[in-house]
From Swiss-Prot:
E.C. designation(s): 2.7.4.25
Family assignment from sequence similarity: Belongs to the cytidylate kinase family. Type 1 subfamily.
Catalytic reactions on record: CMP + ATP = CDP + ADP; dCMP + ATP = dCDP + ADP
Highest taxon listed in the record's lineage: Bacteria
Keywords, alphabetical: ATP-binding, Cytoplasm, Kinase, Nucleotide-binding, Transferase
NCBIfam families with a match to the protein in the record: cmk
Organism: Sinorhizobium medicae (strain WSM419) (Ensifer medicae)
Keyword Nucleotide-binding: yes
Swiss-Prot/TrEMBL GO biological process terms: pyrimidine nucleotide metabolic process
Top-level taxonomy: Bacteria, Pseudomonadati, Pseudomonadota, Alphaproteobacteria, Hyphomicrobiales
Protein name in UniProt: Cytidylate kinase
Cellular component terms (Gene Ontology): cytoplasm
HAMAP family per the UniProt record, alphabetical: Cytidyl_kinase_type1
GO terms, molecular function: ATP binding; CMP kinase activity; dCMP kinase activity
Length: 212
């Protein structure tokens, strides 16, 4: 049976970086579930299909190849906006959750990060983490990431976008963003990624020892 680490949290909280570090440390497979929605959105855009037709979006979502998710390509702002539109569709979420659950069965273990892993996708995960940080800190991280990459950004715009995404994610009727009752909270507002990794590693090691 696969060992699953579920990592949830709002945008720019550091869950993606933490997930990749954990996957590398333990030799687990990693899936950023947000990219699955972006991949479905990109496929719709590329095919010139509407973003407001749930049946079409569901069919497209079922054809997403989870092994070919290119973060660099899928990080485009336009794709993110399109992904937000189809992510609220229950049929699309069901289709992608099925694919995500199938991915979670991979041996020897998997790390899935997103918004509803511990609550919906993998409620029986061995370890559940909820990674968060203040909106101000998350906006600053996103701003620094863009500027460091050579882009231009406005902090106020990013901050408002972060708050808007939080409201949308937490207020969604289908699979809203919230910590699982048995999730371990990691607030990275004033915590380095290394400290967050060590905290997660301690929890994972304890859980792994229980499975031996």
């Amino acid at each position: 049976m696969s060992f699953v680490v579920a990592i949830d949290g709002p945008a720019a909280a550091g869950k993606g970086t933490l997930s990749r570090l954990i996957a590398k440390r333990y030799g687990f497979h990693h899936l950023d579930t947000g990219l699955t929605y972006r991949a479905a959105a990109k496929a719709l855009i590329d095919a010139g299909l509407p973003l407001d037709d749930e049946a079409v979006a569901e069919k497209t979502a079922r054809q997403v190849d989870l092994s070919g998710l290119d973060r660099a390509v899928l990080s485009a702002h336009a794709i993110g906006e399109a992904a937000s539109k189809i992510a609220v569709m229950p049929a699309v979420r069901r289709a992608l959750v099925e694919a995500q659950r199938a991915f979670a069965l991979k041996e020897p273990g998997t790390v899935l990060d997103g918004r509803d892993i511990g609550t919906v996708v993998c409620p029986d995960a061995a370890v559940k983490l909820y990674v968060t940080a203040s909106p101000e800190v998350r906006a600053k991280r996103r701003y620094d990431e863009i500027v460091t990459g050579g882009g231009t950004a406005d902090y106020t715009t990013i901050f408002e976008d972060v708050k808007k995404r939080d409201t949308r994610d937490m207020g969604r009727a289908d699979s809203p963003l919230r910590p699982a009752e048995d999730a371990h909270l990691l607030d990275t507002s004033e915590m380095s990624i290394e400290a967050a990794f060590q905290a997660a590693k301690t929890l994972i090691d304890v859980a792994l020892n229980k499975t031996i």
